[in-house]
């Protein structure tokens, strides 16, 4: 598990019409997290991802600035190294009918103030790819141990996130795959 930290924008609710396995025209939605420093970069990536998806109508795109402090990388992600606007895509190969995906894990850290001796708490959210919510908890514990986290913490909430991919710079990807 490695951390992806940076400025992220979220391309939420990219909606278009496509065909299902039976050939019927159906609405399709997808969400992607992209490392972008500004709205213009995210918009450029969104339009690149939408290219060719307008066969049955317009593509609706909503871009939301999302501050994501950490995404823990692991081999649950499949990787597409073909660059899209200079970014590598991490995605999930499993169908949407499974629990495989990105999970938001909310943590509360407990710190002891050295001057007063009182315990202070701070909140954090880490996104982690996993096959299930219980595996997300295991992955977070492993990630924090490898990161050298020494503070006590409590996992408060584990929530499935609808993002279907995470797009990162080649440099971030190289840092993630180093053993």
Report residues per predicted region.
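Intrinsic disorder/low-complexity detector
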Residues: 7, 24-25, 48, 52-111, ...
């Amino acid at each position: 598990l490695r951390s992806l930290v940076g400025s992220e924008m979220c391309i939420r609710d990219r909606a278009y019409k496509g065909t299902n396995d039976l050939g019927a025209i159906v609405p399709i939605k997808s969400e992607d997290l992209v490392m972008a420093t500004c709205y213009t970069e995210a918009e450029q990536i969104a339009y690149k991802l939408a290219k060719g998806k307008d066969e049955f109508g317009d593509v609706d795109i909503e871009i939301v600035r999302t501050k994501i402090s950490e995404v823990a990388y692991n081999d649950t992600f499949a990787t597409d190294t073909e660059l899209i606007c200079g970014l590598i895509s991490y995605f999930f190969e499993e169908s949407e009918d499974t629990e495989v995906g990105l999970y938001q894990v909310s943590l509360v850290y407990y710190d002891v103030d050295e001057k007063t001796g009182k315990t202070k708490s701070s909140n954090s959210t880490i996104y982690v790819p996993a096959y299930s919510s219980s595996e997300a908890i295991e992955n977070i514990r492993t990630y924090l141990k490898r990161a050298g986290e020494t503070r006590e913490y409590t996992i408060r909430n584990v929530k499935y996130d609808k993002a279907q991919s995470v797009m990162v710079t080649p440099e971030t990807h190289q840092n993630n795959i180093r053993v």
